[in-house]
Design a protein with these regions (language model features):
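Short, acidic/turn-prone active-site loops that include or flank metal/cofactor-
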Residues: 16, 41-43, 59-66, 121-123, ...
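Phosphate- and divalent-cation-binding pockets in alpha/beta enzyme and binding domains
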Residues: 45-46, 99, 125-126, 182-183
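Short hydrophobic/aromatic-enriched beta-strand-loop microsegments
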Residues: 54-61, 112-116, 135-142, 191-200
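Catalytic-loop motifs flanking and including active-site residues across diverse enzymes
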Residues: 73, 119, 123, 179
Length: 267
């Protein structure tokens, strides 16, 4: 399939925000969909690619203040598909990584509505690429763990990790929140050494990217940028602390992104 089909819901990953990091499949669906239901974190640069006759609606939720309930999102998807429209449910990053896609898939199945999941570049992979550092390493990081600092309603007091964290793991915390001190305490309880590198990166792989780095013993007082933020922890991040991945090198990557987004004629 090259374009969208009527009566189908497409759960599409928008990637980290740079339109050039969209998949070809995602772009074709945006150009042909009748209805686009998007999260708040999907930037205007991506929404600008939507067909001009499509109905575009924000259904995002931020800081616990939903514009629409999850059940309401389900209803919009199902009603639009049953009306014979092609529907793109556009999510930041990858739909299947902390994107509540499981709930939406269950609702579509229960309603006997056809759907397709279109993967996107998740923020963790975008962050590693933007920083020029691999998330895994043959010698120091043979495991990669994704977790979230934002749990289901009423469970935000739960620790990000239970038990001992493997020494050879890179931990990626999605939505860590502002209280990095709490996370630092939980990492210590999980057996993470004080000299392990930590990097908080905001708006990874976009023109708004910023990042700060410290060892675990400095994480308590570290201030990260505006949401969305990722916290990366592990020996694989040591190059940032040691200066192997310089801030100047990172700025070059961001400047190139800025040229692509601001100037359509840039090579």
């Amino acid at each position: 399939m090259t374009t969208s089909e009527k009566g189908v819901v497409y759960l599409v990953g928008a990637g980290p925000g740079d339109p050039e990091l969209l998949t070809v499949r995602a772009l074709r669906l945006l150009e042909s969909a009748d209805v686009v239901l998007h999260d708040d974190l999907v930037p205007a640069e991506v929404l600008a690619l939507v067909h001009r006759h499509a109905l575009v609606t924000s259904v995002g939720k931020r800081c616990g203040r939903p514009r629409i309930t999850q059940a309401g999102i389900h209803a919009l998807m199902i009603e639009s598909a049953r009306a014979g429209q092609s529907v793109v449910r556009l999510k930041s990053g990858d739909p299947l990584v902390f994107g509540r896609a499981g709930e939406e898939i269950a609702a579509l199945r229960a309603a006997c509505v056809r759907f397709e999941v279109v993967p996107g570049v998740t923020a963790a992979f975008a962050a590693g690429a933007a920083l020029g550092l691999p998330l895994t390493d043959r010698k120091s990081a043979s495991k990669l763990i994704f977790c979230t600092g934002h749990h289901a309603d009423g469970k935000d007091s739960a620790p990000i990790w239970s038990g001992r964290l493997p020494d050879d793991a890179t931990l990626v915390v999605y939505m860590p929140g502002r209280d990095l001190g709490r996370i630092a305490r939980e990492l210590r309880e999980a057996g993470v050494a004080e000299d392990v590198a930590c990097c908080a990166i905001s708006h990874a792989a976009t023109v708004r990217q910023s990042w700060v780095v410290a060892r675990l013993d400095g994480l308590d007082g570290m201030e990260c940028g505006p949401a969305p933020v990722l916290l990366l922890v592990g020996r694989a991040m040591a190059g940032l602390v040691e200066g192997k991945a310089s801030h100047a090198e990172t700025l070059c990557v961001i400047e190139e992104l800025a040229v692509r987004l601001v100037s359509p004629d840039a090579e």
